[in-house]
């Protein structure tokens, strides 16, 4: 820590000190000393292609494609998403939490409850604002709210919070989950590896879903199915739904923003929301926290607690989940009328307590051990 403090890197020194690390390694490049929390190439000669391009009020570093290291990743503008990130970053800096070192110091000073309350208030303000916008558009014909987002982005929790806020705006929400409209297991499409492709839009019973959607919007009552993930079949348990005079239909699922899902409904009746986990807090000024790490940790805990999956199972399936997101979710995120950031300032500190013992069950001989070890090293900060 002294080495970094002498070079004016107080953010890095605070992080190392708050993590209780008396010693740490460091990297040197042409006289410049720094530390990176992950793998580095042995020399700059390994980096054959890269580019820097203007992006908003900064620059975007273009890196090689994983599958084709001689070609750069294409530049895909995500203007709405980046704007939400900037707003969250501004709020975070307003409360003096630029990085994990600042967060750890606040916790050590007994300010945990204040950090939690500020985080909750920031999110509730966002939810209330979106609900007010939906209520304002209700008079112009909006009757369907579509909520999408990648795995473990907090869609279901957001959906529940939004429904409460809609009620305060005198709107009656009628909730519908796309998870209940999966095809029976034997009818589910398979991927190139011959495995069931549950991430595909066509894993849903689209004709049946659209038929039920039309009935609801026409004022008819429907019986909502429930998908049994253990048997892989749709079952009916007598749950009925019917829209009232002041109702909006709130549909939640990873494919909700895909135009093909609700192609039979005109856009003027829809309000689209994209939920993501934009982890704006960074480890220090030179090391950011990937949003995918936050979501992966959420999913590991959720799968372990509610689905009986080990950390090894979740880590093994994660690449397939990510491929599905790249194909079926991310291309439609900029179609959203509103975006919601479900990341909490204190979240990673809270996840650590549950995630560490689960990740610790991955054995050294398991293929997933390298990823589990990386996550454990990251959580120690």
Predicted features along the sequence, with ranges:
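Auxiliary tRNA-acceptor-end handling modules of aminoacyl-tRNA synthetases
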Residues: 1-126, 130, 134-138
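Conserved NTP phosphate-binding and transfer environment spanning the P-loop NTPase/kinase superfamily
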Residues: 138, 262-381
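Hydrophobic anchor at the beta1->P-loop junction of P-loop NTPases
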Residues: 145-147
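P-loop (Walker A) phosphate-binding loop of NTP-binding proteins
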Residues: 150
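Conserved glycine(s) of the Walker
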Residues: 154
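Hydrophobic positions on the alpha1 helix immediately C-terminal to the Walker A/P-loop
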Residues: 157-162, 177
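Post-Walker A helix-loop "phosphate-sensing" segment adjacent to the P-loop in P-loop NTPases
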Residues: 164-174
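Conserved nucleotide-sensing/catalytic segment adjacent to the nucleotide-binding pocket
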Residues: 174-176, 183-232, 248
């Amino acid at each position: 820590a002294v080495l970094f403090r002498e070079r004016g890197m107080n953010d890095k020194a605070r992080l190392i000190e708050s993590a209780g690390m008396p010693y740490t390694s460091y990297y040197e490049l042409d006289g410049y000393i720094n530390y990176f929390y992950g793998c580095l190439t042995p020399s700059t000669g390994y980096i054959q292609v890269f580019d820097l391009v203007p992006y908003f009020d900064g620059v975007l570093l273009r890196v090689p494609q994983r599958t084709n290291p001689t070609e750069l990743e294409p530049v895909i503008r995500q203007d709405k998403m980046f704007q939400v990130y900037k707003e969250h970053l501004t709020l975070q800096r307003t409360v003096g939490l630029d990085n994990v070192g600042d967060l750890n110091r606040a916790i050590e000073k007994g300010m945990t409850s204040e950090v939690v309350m500020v985080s909750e208030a920031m999110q509730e303000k966002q939810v209330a604002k979106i609900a007010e916008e939906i209520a304002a558009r209700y008079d112009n014909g909006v009757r369907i709210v579509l909520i999408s987002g990648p795995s473990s982005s907090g869609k279901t929790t957001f959906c529940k919070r939004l429904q409460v806020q809609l009620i305060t705006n005198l709107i009656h929400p009628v909730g519908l989950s796309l998870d209940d409209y999966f095809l029976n297991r034997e009818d589910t499409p398979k991927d190139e590896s011959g495995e069931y492709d549950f991430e595909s839009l066509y894993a849903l019973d689209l004709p049946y879903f659209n038929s039920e959607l039309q009935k609801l919007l026409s004022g008819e009552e429907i019986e909502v199915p429930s998908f049994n993930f253990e048997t892989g079949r749709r079952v009916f348990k007598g749950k009925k739904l019917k829209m009232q005079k002041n109702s909006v239909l709130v549909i939640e699922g990873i494919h909700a923003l895909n135009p093909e899902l609700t192609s039979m409904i005109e856009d003027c009746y829809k309000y689209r929301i994209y939920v993501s986990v934009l982890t704006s807090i960074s480890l220090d000024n030179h090391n950011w926290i990937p949003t995918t790490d936050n979501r992966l940790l959420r999913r590991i805990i959720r799968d372990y607690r509610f689905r009986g999956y080990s950390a090894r199972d979740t880590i093994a399936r994660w690449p397939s989940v990510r491929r599905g997101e790249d194909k079926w979710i991310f291309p439609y995120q900029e179609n959203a009328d509103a975006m919601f950031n479900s990341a909490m300032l204190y979240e990673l500190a809270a996840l650590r307590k549950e995630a560490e013992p689960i990740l610790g069950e991955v054995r050294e001989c398991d293929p997933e051990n390298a990823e589990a070890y990386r996550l454990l090293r990251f959580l120690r900060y």
